[in-house]
Amino acid sequence: RLVILTKERGKITVFANGARKAVSQLRAASQSFVMGTFTVFPGRDSYTLVKAEVREYFSGLPLDMEKLCYASYVCEFMSYYTREGCYCVNELNLLYVTLKALEQGTVDNQLIRYAFEVRLMDIEGQGIHAYTCVRCNKKELKYFNAKAGGLLCEACGKELKLTRTVSETLIYTLQYIQSADLTKLYAFQLSEEAMAELKYVADRFREAYIDREFKSLEILSSL
């Protein structure tokens, strides 16, 4: 049984009969982290894989335990937001550039992870409000509050509990992640201090709006 994210029908369950056999033409397509063109036959509750043309294996991911764990988390997080019957071209493109960035290894894995989280949640309409105050729409931003939905101006921030002052770097970083062309999403680096700030904001926001434990995240935390 395979789970495939498609641009036309969203996340679908597919059975690849005989894929485990060494001589099966579907064997390569049944591996993890494979992208390509899949021909499926629809059934009552699932699909049957008939043919597959693999275009990308991301073969570098299984060779590195840390990359493998991050890639697994990316797929699990994507699975949480996707379902069958949806047009998922933005999600599929984001997944591709993210796995490619992890495989290439030129950008910090942790930065890729959090940029992916922020961008996907924004695509799904659950993103951090990062351009104006989430309460009054002022453009002068100073605080972050997860339960409020994002960034706040000084006046609104002082009225709420559990707010945290944010830097101009953090504000720009969030805006860049949400608006950058996907081909340039991972074309930046952050200082250690800025990375810690992004991590805090992304973690608090995810915890506030996603009530699910990710198994791959538990493994990542143990590395």
Locations of the language-model features?
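Non-catalytic alpha-helical scaffolds and adjoining flexible linkers that form interface surfaces
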Residues: R1, L5-L223
